[in-house]
């Protein structure tokens, strides 16, 4: 081949290699931000400043989003529609200070590693990572490697870890058998974690997810639990300042006819389908700075089920609905020294406001995952539409929801 022909060929080859490499690098999520409240959808309770799990002091969230390729599926090549979400309960500054936690499985057709030790010890160590079903193993190993490189040994001098890594299945849009999530993608999600406002929708581990047969993914919401609410009926009781409770979901569950938004059966009004049967899952994380012990956090995790049910889910046989709750209170409670220590605890009798906040924030987080999203075309040109904003607003208006479109309900005697 002549030099004249070689030069353009080499240039083209180099360009293709650069494009292929860049396509597999973490990419930013779309800049559009339209949340449920922006559409006038009413929710009970008062959200925090960011209406996100990051309203809980110390909590940080980071993403790696991987999108590349189009057309026919070629296993190992793509198309790629996946990613990683990392949640750091105490942030990077206190990575080696475990938090009290509680775990609950509503339906166990899924995986969340490390929960046997959470159940046994009551502690959650290090970041929580969310990804796709077939990347759990590499994500778990990557978390351990990252902690070894950036953390320190425990109080006994051992460097060991049982990370919490959870999954939902993105194989309708993503080359899930191609193992595109690499250790560096997990590291990027951890290292990019931050407080403040966070992205939602098709981002991080939620990139290729489908919820109620609309484009799903990552959603979040928060609630402020006022001091008066946790002080009980005795107004003279001393109580701390307000507590924060936040929820983050990776939403990949439900059939379209089930979708319910503030009592309105939205899914039945917008026909369409993706699956022949439910194949999805949902991971729900609940974080709070209220001083709760592991058994109380397990109770909190259970209440996420009620928020999920508000959106219409019945937690089908094929759905992996796994929930974990943690508290950032009681720092250093896991330290070996001193041998006896004091911790703070909220009485069980005062937990109802936290239960309410969990249900409310879970419901809103799931709807946010649907609203702050966009259509996506994935493997084999599978197309999943986002929930149409204008149609949703039209439905809410048509059914004349009182108090910004809240549904009217029958009482126990069947009267309106």
List PLM regions with ranges.
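N-terminal secretory signal peptides that target proteins for export/translocation
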Residues: 1-6
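Bacterial N-terminal signal peptides
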Residues: 8-20
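Alpha/propeptide regions of enzymes that mature by internal proteolysis
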Residues: 24-416
